[in-house]
Every structure is written in C-alpha cells, then in structure tokens.
A protein has these predicted regions:
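Substrate-binding cleft of carbohydrate-active enzyme catalytic domains
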Residues: 1-143
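Substrate-binding cleft/loops of secretory-pathway carbohydrate-active enzymes
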Residues: 42-46, 105-107, 148-180
Length: 180
C-alpha cells in the first residue's frame, strides 16, 4: 500500500464520531516493537541499529526495525503518543500489535539490550519483551486504557503475555493454542 500521508487529529476525531454514531468503536493500533517503518524513517535514533537512510515502507512484510526499549527518548515519545490517543479515541483499548518482531535478529544483538539483560539477569529476549509489554501496558493504564496484542506462538511458549492482556490470533490454525 503506497504511503499517502497521515490523518490530522481533527480528521481522526471526526472519523471516531462518525463511527460512534453508527455503533462502531474505533480501536487504535500502535505497533510495537516492530511494524513501525514510518517511525524508523522519522526517528532512526529510536532504533537498535539506526539507519538515517530508512524510507517509509510501502509494502507488507517484516523488517528488522525494532525500537530500542533502552533509549529514554523512546519512552518519552510513547508517553506523548499515548496522551494524545486519550484525547482522540474514547475507546478503553489500544492495540499494541506485538507481532512479527524479529527479536533474535535485533534485540538479541543490540548492545543496549544485551547490557540490560545481563544487568537484570534475564535469560533471553523473551523476558525482555515481556517486561517491555508490561511497561507499555502500565503507561496506557494511566490513561484508562487496556491493551490488545496479536498472538505469536513462540512468545506464548515463552510466557510473554501478562495477566489481563487480550490476545488475537491472525495466523491460520493458531486459535486452539491461544485458549490452552
């Protein structure tokens, strides 16, 4: 899908009102830690391996651009985004994506992530991801929001989902494993 700009806050508010008048709840999705190529193009310094030549992705698929959870500016950015969401979307839910994040190719090799895991005694990137999702959830809870996530089987086996998370399957055949 070609990149064709963005919605203004006012346009989003009008869309939410239009949908609400028809009984439809609009739930925003802010993808983390991956699927954020536009963010990588705008703020390459937020990522484990910054590349100032990153372009906005115009097709589907997975990239190696994962935000680095150990850069303070990343958390300031998301705090501001979550505050703005509260003013635009009355829904009590924010979907965080959370799928198709190649942790073994990014966080596993990120110097800041490696240092953090060593300091905290974490055995792998899945423990780091669980903590990351929990922190994102806490930040949204301040604004009265709860999270939803896409289901990833390896992450479920690693027990990254926290109590109260709503998880959706999107890959064929995975639904039975989400309810076990």
């Amino acid at each position: 899908i070609p990149h064709e700009g963005m919605y203004t806050k006012q346009e989003l508010k009008e869309l939410v009102a239009y949908c609400a008048a028809r009984g439809i709840e609009v739930i925003p999705e802010i993808d983390v830690p991956g699927h954020n190529q536009a963010l990588a193009a705008a703020y390459p310094e937020f990522f484990c391996f910054p590349n100032p030549d990153t372009k906005v992705k115009t097709d589907e698929g997975v990239t190696l651009h994962l935000i680095c959870p150990h850069k303070p500016e990343v958390w300031k950015f998301y705090a501001a985004v979550f505050k703005e969401l509260k003013d635009i979307f009355p829904s009590g839910i924010v979907h965080l994506g959370g799928d198709e994040a190649p942790l073994e190719k990014t966080w596993a090799k990120c110097p800041l992530s490696i240092q953090y895991r060593e300091q905290k005694g974490m055995k792998d990137v899945h423990e780091e991801l669980k903590e990351f999702i929990k922190k994102m959830s806490s930040m949204l809870a301040v604004h009265g929001k709860r999270i939803q996530l896409w289901y990833e089987k390896p992450w479920a086996r690693a027990n990254i989902y926290n109590k109260g998370d709503t998880v959706f399957t999107w890959r064929m055949g995975l639904t039975p494993s989400t309810i076990t």
